């Protein structure tokens, strides 16, 4: 089994929102590895960062990604930093991976400058810019397709991704 597609991208790119709309459009299940991590840990990601640290969160994230790549059959959204792990990038080979690209102004507007996002807690705009700059090459490297999300609704994006999948 394999997911219909895997969505990757930075915070604010719309992975969860677009993923839910896409899954509904395709009539398949939607999974978000961030939610899987929270279920495994029994607490929100922000608390995992505070209590156990980012390294522990990333280990849980790698496990969640590996499990979902092996079992998910619908649309799978990965956490924004999942592609930083070489193990995850290697596991994505052979999957249909859609990179939801977003520029800083739209990302800032969508994430609300750090609400519930531990990596954006201090100087969120500068941190988000750094994350975008740091991670873009990783998203591009794993992607089989890229969709620009700026100024578009989740429904418009879901239709575009569905068309890419059908092509």
From Swiss-Prot:
Binding site for Mg(2+): 16
PANTHER family: SHIKIMATE KINASE (PTHR21087), SHIKIMATE KINASE 1, CHLOROPLASTIC (PTHR21087:SF16)
Descriptive protein name: Shikimate kinase
Keyword terms: Amino-acid biosynthesis, Aromatic amino acid biosynthesis, ATP-binding, Cytoplasm, Kinase, Magnesium, Metal-binding, Nucleotide-binding, Transferase
Keyword hit for Cytoplasm: yes
E.C. number: 2.7.1.71
Reactions it catalyzes: shikimate + ATP = 3-phosphoshikimate + ADP + H(+)
Compartments, as annotated in UniProt: Cytoplasm
Domain of life: Bacteria
Keyword Cell membrane: no
Organism: Salinispora arenicola (strain CNS-205)
GO cellular component: cytosol
Family that this chain belongs to: Belongs to the shikimate kinase family.
GO molecular function: ATP binding; magnesium ion binding; shikimate kinase activity
């Amino acid at each position: 089994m394999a997911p219909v597609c895997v969505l990757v991208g930075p915070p604010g790119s719309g992975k969860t929102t677009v993923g839910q709309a896409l899954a509904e459009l395709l009539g398949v299940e939607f999974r978000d590895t961030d939610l899987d991590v929270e279920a495994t840990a029994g607490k929100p990601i922000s608390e995992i960062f505070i209590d156990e640290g980012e390294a522990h969160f990333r280990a849980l994230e790698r496990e969640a990604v590996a499990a979902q790549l092996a079992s998910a059959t619908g649309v799978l959204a990965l956490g924004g930093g999942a592609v930083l792990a070489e193990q995850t990038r290697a596991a994505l080979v052979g999957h249909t991976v859609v990179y939801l690209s977003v520029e800083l102004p739209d990302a800032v507007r969508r994430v609300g400058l750090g609400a519930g996002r531990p990596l954006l807690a201090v100087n969120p705009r500068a941190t988000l810019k750094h994350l975008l700059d740091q991670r873009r090459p990783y998203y591009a490297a794993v992607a089989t397709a890229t969709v620009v999300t700026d100024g578009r609704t989740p429904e418009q994006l879901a239709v575009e991704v569905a068309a890419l999948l059908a092509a």
